[in-house]
Amino acid sequence: MYDRIGGSSTRTSQTDEPSQSVDSGSFTETLADLAPQWSSRSGELPDKMGACCSKPDTLDANVQTSSASEPSTSSPESPATSLFEYRTADLRDANVDGICVGLTAEWFRNLSNSPSTRMSALTPGSQTHASAAERQQQYQRLKDQLRSRGAGSSQADLQAQNTILEEAGLEPAGEEKRFAFGKSSNVKSMVNEINEDGSNHLLSLYFAEGGAHTVATSASNGTTTLFDPNYGEFTVRSDPDQMASLLQSLANRYRNPNGQHLSTITTQRMQ
């Protein structure tokens, strides 16, 4: 079992990721709307395969990482730095081989540690990073076996993912909730769930181009931290507009410079 997130900081196969300016109004309204759909499996999601690593951005090196004790309180202004204004812990080159499911599992296992310790543990060359790679390989093998037996891509993905999460000592909920990114509905239902104090969620990001990527969130003591294996940790207040703003900035980053358009998010609670 994992613990509540430590420190002061406040599924799917995988592809490339992304930035663009975001308005400073109510993001809960302008994000309009991750229309919730229950994961009925009637519509198959893309298979999670490939390399979910971000394309390098020459400006990334100049982006300041925020203090872990000071989550962002204002909307990002610069297209190049909008996402990184939220960053409270940096992680580089950990996901170049597309092992985001394994890295996310290991991140959950290390929640009781400080942000810097969590990122150090996931650095390439570490034992934890090697373990993440092994979990990813197991996930892929299980998924391939299930597909060969006739399972649909979504069913195979969820079952394989749950298996490796459980073997990592985690307790994933059996089902996922599906949200269509950009459709008119109520984004608050998703961000309120993510922001619930003491909750941990695995989020699968699906892109219109067919790729997918796995990230995670943990909410504790009035702040919510989002972990993206490509970039590190991002932290905001556990406020609907703040969380919606962070998600929009993440979507912007995957669109530019990576050319990936976020279309669907699934959420799975870690019990």
UniProtKB/Swiss-Prot annotation:
Catalytic machinery residues: C100, H213, D228
Disulfide pairings: none
Sequence intervals crossing the membrane: none
Group of enzyme by EC: hydrolase
Keyword Transport: no
GO molecular function, one term: cysteine-type endopeptidase activity
Any Pfam family the entry gives: Peptidase_C58
CDD domains: C58_YopT-like (cd20497)
SUPFAM superfamilies assigned: Cysteine proteinases
Stated name of the protein: Putative cysteine protease YopT-like blr2140
Native species: Bradyrhizobium diazoefficiens (strain JCM 10833 / BCRC 13528 / IAM 13628 / NBRC 14792 / USDA 110)
Lineage: Bacteria, Pseudomonadati, Pseudomonadota, Alphaproteobacteria, Hyphomicrobiales
